[in-house]
Amino acid sequence: MPSSKKKKENVPVMSMAGLIRYYEEEHEKYKVDPIYVIIASIVLVAVVVAVTKIIPP
């Protein structure tokens, strides 16, 4: 048997169709409230504006 024939037999049908399998055991990501992201971006903009006022580019 050619090696390509063996490889095709080992590949799941869903993978051959282009579908992705998601496993239940995935690493948890950090969960951040959207309000914290908004506050952090406003603070960052304020810091950048303040620094450009103090030290002109």
Curated annotation (Swiss-Prot):
Parts of the chain on the Cytoplasmic side? 1-33
Give the Extracellular membrane side ranges.
Answer: 56-57
Locate the transmembrane regions by residue number.
Answer: 34-55
Q: Which UniProt keywords apply?
A: Cell membrane, Membrane, Protein transport, Translocation, Transmembrane, Transmembrane helix, Transport
The record's InterPro entries line, in alphabetical order, gives:
Preprot_translocase_SecG, SecG/Sec61-beta/Sbh
What is any one GO biological process for this UniProt entry?
Answer: protein transport
Q: Where in the cell is it found?
A: Cell membrane
Q: Give a GO cellular-component term.
A: plasma membrane
Membrane topology is: Single-pass membrane protein
What domain of life does the native source organism fall in?
A: Archaea
Q: What is its main location?
A: membrane
* Subunit text: Component of the protein translocase complex. Heterotrimer consisting of alpha (SecY), beta (SecG) and gamma (SecE) subunits. Can form oligomers of the heterotrimer.
Which family is annotated?
Belongs to the SEC61-beta family.
Q: What is this protein for, i.e. what is its function?
A: Involved in protein export. The function of the beta subunit is unknown, but it may be involved in stabilization of the trimeric complex.
- Please state what the protein is called: Preprotein translocase subunit SecG
Q: Which organism is it from?
A: Metallosphaera sedula (strain ATCC 51363 / DSM 5348 / JCM 9185 / NBRC 15509 / TH2)
